[in-house]
Swiss-Prot record:
Protein name (database record): Acetaldehyde dehydrogenase 1
Catalysed reactions listed for this entry: acetaldehyde + NAD(+) + CoA = acetyl-CoA + NADH + H(+)
A Pfam family matched in the record: AcetDehyd-dimer
EC number: 1.2.1.10
Alphabetical list of InterPro entries matching this protein: Acetaldehyde_dehydrogenase (IPR003361), Acetylaldehyde_DH_C (IPR015426), NAD(P)-bd_dom_sf (IPR036291), Semialdehyde_DH_NAD-bd (IPR000534)
Family, as annotated: Belongs to the acetaldehyde dehydrogenase family.
Sections of the chain in a coiled coil: none
Organism: Methylibium petroleiphilum (strain ATCC BAA-1232 / LMG 22953 / PM1)
Listed SUPFAM superfamilies: Glyceraldehyde-3-phosphate dehydrogenase-like, C-terminal domain (SSF55347), NAD(P)-binding Rossmann-fold domains (SSF51735)
GO biological process: catabolic process
Active site positions: C130 (acyl-thioester intermediate)
Enzyme category, top tier: oxidoreductase
Length: 303
C-alpha cells in the first residue's frame, strides 16, 4: 500500500502524540520532525523512531521537501509562526494541517464537516483547538435538530498537558474556538472558556457545553442526535464519553463530557492531546486517500 509522506513541525506534547498516531496510519508515513531546540525530547524521540530531524525550524526542512517526497505537513507550533510556515510549504506544493489556533484556513471538525472538505483543493485546513474538537460536535448535534441562539463551551485540561506553545496562544484559543462554535457548530453566537487545572495527580480532560435554543428544545430528538454524534467521535477517539446530560432547563441544553486519551505520549488524562491529534490524523488520511487514488493533486501556491 502506498503511503503519503508527512512532516511534523513542533516536537512538543501535540507533535509527539501525533507522531505516535501517524506511525499506525495505513496511508500516512511520517518522515520528518522539525523543531527549534536541538535538545528537545520530542526531536530525540522522533530520531529514535527513524525520522529525519532538524532543529533549524521550517527553513531546515525546505531543501529536503522535494527529495523526500513530503506532501502533507502538520503544524503543531504556535499561531504566531504558522502563517509563515504555511506560506513557505504551500509554495512547494505541501498541504498544511494546522493544529495551532492561527485559523488562516477553513475549520475542520471531522464528525461534523470532514466530508465538506472533499474536492475543495484546500492547501491549508485548521483543526480549531482541542477544546473545539471536544465540544463543537455537541453544539452541532443540537443545531442539527433546531436553531441554537448561543453556544458556550468550557474546556478543563490538566496543567501538565498544556505546553508552552498552547499557553502563549490562550487568547487565540478562545477566539478561534468561539468562532468555530459559530461557523462549524452552528450557534448564532459562540463563547469559549479554557481552564488549566494544576491539580496533582492531573485531571482528565472535562468539557461542558451549554446551548440556548431559539425555540423550546425537542428533548427526544436532541438526545438522540447527541448520542449519535458521540458514536461518530468515538470512531477515532474511543475515550470520548458522556458523563452527564443532556440536561434540559427551559431553553438551555447542557452536556458534560470527559475525554480520555490513549496514553501515546502523556498518560491517559491528556485526552486534549488525543482529540486534537486523532482529528488531525483522520483529516490528513482523507486527503491522503484522495492523493493515492489520484483524485487530488496538490498545487504550489505562489508565495
Amino acid at each position: 500500500m502506498k503511503k503519503i509522506k508527512c512532516a511534523l513541525i513542533g516536537p512538543g506534547n501535540i507533535g509527539t502524540d501525533l507522531l505516535a498516531k501517524l506511525q499506525r496510519s495505513p496511508v500516512l508515513e511520517p518522515v520528518w520532525m522539525v523543531g527549534i531546540d536541538p535538545g528537545s525530547d520530542g526531536l530525540k524521540r522522533a530520531r529514535d523512531a527513524g525520522l529525519k530531524t532538524t532543529a533549524e525550524g521550517v527553513d531546515g526542512l525546505l531543501p529536503h521537501v522535494k527529495a523526500d517526497g513530503v506532501q502533507i505537513a502538520f503544524d503543531a507550533t504556535s499561531a504566531y509562526v504558522h502563517a509563515e510556515n504555511s506560506r513557505k510549504l504551500n509554495a512547494l506544493g505541501v498541504m498544511m494541517i494546522d493544529l495551532t489556533p492561527a485559523a488562516i484556513g477553513p475549520f475542520c471538525v471531522p464528525p461534523v464537516n470532514l466530508k465538506q472538505h472533499l474536492g475543495r483543493r484546500e492547501m491549508n485546513v485548521n483543526m480549531v483547538t482541542c477544546g473545539g474538537q471536544a465540544t463543537i460536535p455537541m453544539v452541532a448535534a443540537v443545531s442539527q435538530v433546531q436553531a441554537v441562539a448561543y453556544g458556550e463551551i468550557v474546556a478543563t485540561v490538566s496543567s501538565r498537558s498544556v505546553g508552552p506553545g498552547t499557553r502563549k496562544n490562550i487568547d487565540e484559543f478562545t477566539r478561534t474556538t468561539a468562532g468555530a462554535v459559530e461557523k462549524v457548530g452552528g450557534a448564532k453566537k459562540g463563547k469559549a472558556i479554557i481552564i488549566i487545572n494544576p491539580a496533582e495527580p492531573p485531571l482528565i480532560m472535562r468539557d461542558t457545553v451549554h446551548c440556548l435554543t431559539v425555540d423550546e428544545p425537542d428533548r427526544d430528538r436532541i438526545t438522540a442526535s447527541i448520542h449519535q454524534m458521540i458514536r461518530e467521535v468515538q470512531k477515532y477517539v474511543p475515550g470520548y464519553k458522556l458523563v452527564n446530560g443532556p440536561v434540559f432547563d427551559g431553553k438551555r441544553v447542557s452536556v458534560f463530557m470527559e475525554v480520555e486519551g490513549l496514553g501515546d505520549y502523556l498518560p491517559k488524562y491528556a485526552g486534549n492531546l488525543d482529540i486534537m491529534t486523532a482529528a488531525a490524523a483522520r483529516t490528513a488520511e482523507m486527503f491522503a486517500e484522495e492523493l493515492i487514488a489520484g483524485t487530488l493533486k496538490l498545487e504550489a501556491v505562489p508565495a
